[in-house]
């Protein structure tokens, strides 16, 4: 086995070329690229869309960097077992589930005077603290509370001891390089090191590490703490929601055996070949969509005058992932196949 860990883009290509139960449909990629391009071209979708969501912070400050870091330290595994009510946070008279419940819970805690976004606080956080902070309107608790507390303690201690008590200091040390910042995150925090073995090759996905950088970039609109000229180094964020959207768009194809597992709600263990095929093919599918959209952009008057660095800020795999995630959430109730169920801290 090669000890060299492939980065997510290489991993996606490698996994796609060695998969048995997941494949890509070129017609679906072509259709999806047309849909995405129309949305980008009409300015209906850009990094500014991130701040349109009511629960995301609007202020471009160091405090917001700390908010985003806590968000993506906890940004995983919101699905609940069949038959259970969803984990639900009520905030300002509205109920939120899943990822949005996480955002609402962080905001509610801050409003209640809890210093949840300070490493000095969460380096010592307990499960009971998290139970209170993320208390639910239903009988269903936030999943994986013990693992979430462990993540916060790990990252809080390292930020407090090594990085002047803030992820903002790591960003400054990375000197506007998304590539360097990704390396710093995965090398300093075990809970962000999302990799594994596939066909005797070490591969990586780095879902939360990449989305941490992408959320910062989007919130800060590519400026200040969010200035990353190489933002197009990042890939899509291989989770359980975007693959479902890619399947609905006809981009991903699943074997009958895999479809049966999904329809019957069977748990797929983290690190299983099926799980890696879903995630790796999703990365490679979005790369192919990105390349197709990029070709269209270069022929379009809206984008043709931009140089490659400028174009990368408007068009990249991050933006396409954001679009596909929102698409997947919007069609969730009528999706043609359920999400794959893997219980893990990595997504």
Curated annotation (Swiss-Prot):
Q: InterPro entries in the record, alphabetically?
A: Q_salvage
The UniProt entry's GO biological process terms, in alphabetical order, are:
tRNA-guanine transglycosylation
Q: What residues form the catalytic site here?
A: 239 (nucleophile or transition state stabilizer)
Q: Which family does it belong to?
A: Belongs to the QNG1 protein family.
Does the keyword Zinc feature in the UniProt annotation?
Answer: no
Molecular functions (GO terms): hydrolase activity
What taxonomic ancestry is recorded? Eukaryota, Metazoa, Cnidaria, Anthozoa, Hexacorallia
Q: What class of enzyme is it?
A: hydrolase
Function (record text): Catalyzes the hydrolysis of queuosine 5'-phosphate, releasing the nucleobase queuine (q). Is required for salvage of queuine from exogenous queuosine (Q) that is imported and then converted to queuosine 5'-phosphate intracellularly.
Protein name per its UniProtKB record:
Queuosine 5'-phosphate N-glycosylase/hydrolase
Keywords noted in UniProt: Hydrolase
Reaction catalysed? Answer: queuosine 5'-phosphate + H2O = queuine + D-ribose 5-phosphate
């Amino acid at each position: 086995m090669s000890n060299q860990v492939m980065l997510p883009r290489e991993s996606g290509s490698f996994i796609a070329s060695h998969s048995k139960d997941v494949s890509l449909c070129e017609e679906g990629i072509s259709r999806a690229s047309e849909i995405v391009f129309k949305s980008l071209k009409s300015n209906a979708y850009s990094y500014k869309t991130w701040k349109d969501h009511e629960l995301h912070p609007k202020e471009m400050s160091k405090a917001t960097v700390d908010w985003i870091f806590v968000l993506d330290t906890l940004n995983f595994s919101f699905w609940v077992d069949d038959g259970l009510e969803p984990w639900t946070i009520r905030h300002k008279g509205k109920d939120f589930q899943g990822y949005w419940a996480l955002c609402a819970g962080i905001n509610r805690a801050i409003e209640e005077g809890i210093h949840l976004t300070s490493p000095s606080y969460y380096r010592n956080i307990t499960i009971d603290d998290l139970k209170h902070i993320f208390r639910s309107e239903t009988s269903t608790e936030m999943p994986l509370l013990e693992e979430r507390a462990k993540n916060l303690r790990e990252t809080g201690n390292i930020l407090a001891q090594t990085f002047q008590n803030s992820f903002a200091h790591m960003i400054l040390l990375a000197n506007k390089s998304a590539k360097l910042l990704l390396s710093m995150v995965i090398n300093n925090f075990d809970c962000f090191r999302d990799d594994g073995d596939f066909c005797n090759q070490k591969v990586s996905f780095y879902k939360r590490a990449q989305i941490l950088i992408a959320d910062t970039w989007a919130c800060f609109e590519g400026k200040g703490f969010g200035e990353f000229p190489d933002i197009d180094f990042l890939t899509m964020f291989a989770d359980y929601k975007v693959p479902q959207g890619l399947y609905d768009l006809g981009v991903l194809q699943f074997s009958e055996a895999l479809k049966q597992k999904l329809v019957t709600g069977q748990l797929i263990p983290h690190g299983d070949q099926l799980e890696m095929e879903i995630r790796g093919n999703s990365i490679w599918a979005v790369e192919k969509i990105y390349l197709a959209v990029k070709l269209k952009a270069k022929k379009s008057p809206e984008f043709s005058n931009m140089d490659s660095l400028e174009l990368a800020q408007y068009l990249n795999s991050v933006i396409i992932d954001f679009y596909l995630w929102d698409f997947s959430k919007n069609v969730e109730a009528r999706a043609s196949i359920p999400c794959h169920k893997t219980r893990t801290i990595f997504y």
